[in-house]
């Protein structure tokens, strides 16, 4: 999707523009000022190299004072770190607790105690991600996904037309033979079989979703294509044998 164009149209129409960047943040160049989004959220367990159970969100400063948090907790309040709330500077409510929110997006943070294990893991993942040249990463991954596309077409797969990112590709059954044989259920069986061979992909919306990373090599890609070719060949041959048996019967 052309996020920059969408952002421009949202601005013209005074529409709040929210982007789920989980599939791209950390490996694809994405600038909130360029796309003019108001909210950019991402789970850290994919391209941000973090653990499951943590997410990050950017919120445009224009909403910091007017948006109220979903979670009402002490860490979003002024002077929450003080030993006693009576030492807080600001509005103390009738219950004896400060009611003023802290400045900035921190007022919108989720509740609960800070996780002393997961948050340092998130920080380390972000440190590594910051060192990655996103442009160079896309060029390298585009080489891999272009080869996956070319090899997939030789087997009978194709991709949706239009521009695409370099780090994800979806191979769809394209030939009439594969379209008739590779039902969604059978595609899941193929994915499970490939997993046993150390080849990992996912079935999403009628396509094999393949997402190489920076440690993926061209040899890995060739192994993927060979394994996929063998699996599809086995299905085609099995179907031919079954048809022959029916004809003989």
Sequence positions of predicted segments:
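Conserved PLP-binding catalytic core of the aspartate aminotransferase-like
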Residues: 140-193, 197, 212-214
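Alpha-helical scaffolding segments of alpha/beta enzyme cores, especially the outer helices
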Residues: 1-8, 12, 143, 147, ...
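Catalytic PLP-binding core of fold-type I/II PLP enzymes
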Residues: 1-39
């Amino acid at each position: 999707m052309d996020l920059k164009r969408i952002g421009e149209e949202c601005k013209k129409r005074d529409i709040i523009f929210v982007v789920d960047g989980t599939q791209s943040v950390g490996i694809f160049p994405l600038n909130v000022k360029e796309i003019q989004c108001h909210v950019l959220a991402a789970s850290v367990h994919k391209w941000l190299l973090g653990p499951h159970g943590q997410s990050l969100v950017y919120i445009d400063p224009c909403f910091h004072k007017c948006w109220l948090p979903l979670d009402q907790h002490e860490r979003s309040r002024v002077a929450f770190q003080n030993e006693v709330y009576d030492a807080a500077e600001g509005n103390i409510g009738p219950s004896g607790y400060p009611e003023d929110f802290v400045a900035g997006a921190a007022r919108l943070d989720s509740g609960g105690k800070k996780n002393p294990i997961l948050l340092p893991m998130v920080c380390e993942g972000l440190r590594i991600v910051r060192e990655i040249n996103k442009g160079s990463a896309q060029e390298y991954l585009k080489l891999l996904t272009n080869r996956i596309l070319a090899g997939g077409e030789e087997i009978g797969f194709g991709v949706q037309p239009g521009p695409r990112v370099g780090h994800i590709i979806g191979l769809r059954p394209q030939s009439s033979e594969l379209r008739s044989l590779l039902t969604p259920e059978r595609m899941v069986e193929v994915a499970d079989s490939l997993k046993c061979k150390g080849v990992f992909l996912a079935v999403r919306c009628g396509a094999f979703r393949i997402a190489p990373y920076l440690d993926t090599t061209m040899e890995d890609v060739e192994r993927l294509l060979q394994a996929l070719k063998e699996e599809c060949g086995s299905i085609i041959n099995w179907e031919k044998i079954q048809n022959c048996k029916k004809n003989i019967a």
